[in-house]
Amino acid sequence: MPEKPDQRAAVVCRGVRGATTAEANQREEILTATRQLLALLIRQNNIQPADIASAIFSTTPDLNAEFPALAARQLGWLEVPLLCTHEANVPGSLQKCIRVMVHWNTDKPQNEIVHVYIKEATRLRPDLSQLPPVDWDELEAWITEHTER
């Protein structure tokens, strides 16, 4: 029996936030850190590329060796509109930081969205940094499996 329209969860566009840090201003460091961040966002929220409306990436001004959005393309986000920008250069703020805001079409309520803050970026949102321990080797294997060649 088909569901009545009022029984289905509405699909809305939700913001999913995340941040990480890179070890150095080097192309591969930026891409690796961004892929790790995106992989955790994808896995924690069960995000499918077809459900992503857009994503905005920002880096602190000390990271300019590569566009972090390239990491999303490498993970198969080929049709997703992506934008990169720099964060405001606020004295004393976290350095070598990559942030992302993913606009995701989902039926999940806001309180079920998992925001991901890892590495040094955990200090930006300690209230949202309570992920279970990350098995970095297993995560890298997942990234390798899901990276476009």
Which residue ranges define each predicted feature?
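Terminal domain-initiation and capping elements
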Residues: M1-R149
